[in-house]
C-alpha cells in the first residue's frame, strides 16, 4: 500500500512469522502471553484510545473465544506453491471468464461510473473481483470464510512477531463496528480478516472505503458497488493507476537478449522486441520492463499499471492472473506462447464432467457448477491419492482422462 504496507505484503510477513510459531505449536507462544480473558480486558485501554465505546467493545469482545485454528493454517500464499500455468489455469478458468462476461454486462453502468470516477479500467476491476471472491460467490460461503473477530483476536493475542499489525487490524475492525458500518456477527472473511467482494482488510475498509451506492454506510458486502469503488480508489491512490493505459504486452524477443531494467518501449523495439500479436505498440514512449515467469514460457513487457495491480497483492503471478483474466473477459485470447509442460485450459463442460465423475465414484465434489472450489479440490486430491497421481488437486485434462478410465 504505497507508503503503507500493501494489503498482502503485511499478510506475507505475518505468514512468515506464523511459520515458526505453527511448527512448535500454538501453545508455546500463547503460554508467553497472559490468559486470553485478561488480555481482552487489558486491550480495552487501546480500544478506548481509538474512540471505541465500552458498549461496542463488550458487544464484540465480551464473550469472544479466540479462533486458534489460524495458527495451524498453511503459512504461504498459493502463488508460491503451484506451477505458474496451474495457478493461471485455476484462476483464469472457463467459469471465471464466462461469469466475468456476465458480470460485465450486468454491472456495465456501475463499472462505467467507476471508470469515470477513478480512472481504473473495468476489466481490471472484474479481474480483481473474480480473483478475490469469484465475483461474490465466496463472500458468505462458510467453507471459505469465517468470523473475523475470533481470528483477529487470536492473532493479536498470540501471534509473536507481527502482533502490532494484528492488534492494529483488530482495532480497525472494532472502529467499523463503532461507526455502525458493520455488524460483528456478519463480518466474516478469510482467516486473516479480509472481507467482502474484493477482500478488504479492516484498514482498507476504514481508509479506502466509499459509500458508492449512497445507502449511508460503507460495506464490502451486499451489492458490489462499495467494494468495487473502494478497490478502484485503492488502485488509483495507492497504486497510482494510470487511466487509459494497459498493464503490458506479451512479446517475442530475440534469442539471447540481455537488455534489462525499465526503459521506454521504443528502446525495447530497437532491441528487437515485438508484440506477440504482431501489432505495433500503441504507446512507444511508455516505460516497461521485461519479465519471463519461467524459462521457455511466454515473455511480457510490463508497464506501470501492472505494478498498480501489485499494490493490491505483491505477487507477480497474482497480478498476471488479474490482468489476463480481465483481458479474457474483454474478449482477448490466450497467451500466444504456452508455458512449458502446461495442459490446455479445461472448458467449463470438462470441469463439470470432472465433478460429475468424482461424484459418481463417491467423492464429494460440492456440486457440478464448473467452478473448482475447496470441495472439488479435496475430492480430486482423494482420487489422485487413490490412483497414485500427484495429489495437487488440479482439475486438468490428465485427471479427466484417469477419471474416464476409472468409470
What do the predicted segments below correspond to?
Residues 346-351, 359-403:
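Short acidic, glycine/serine/threonine-rich helix-capping segments at coil-helix boundaries
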Residues 405-407:
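Short, solvent-exposed mixed-charge patches
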Residues 293, 298-304, 334:
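An alpha-helical appendage that flanks or caps ligand/catalytic pockets
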Residues 1-18:
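N-terminal secretory signal peptides and thylakoid transit peptides that target proteins
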Residues 39-46, 110, 151, 354, ...:
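A general alpha-helix detector
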Residues 54-285, 300, 309-321, 325-326, ...:
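Catalytic glycan-binding domains that act on GlcNAc-containing polysaccharides
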Residues 3, 22-50, 59:
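C-terminal segment of N-terminal export signals and the immediately downstream linker at the start
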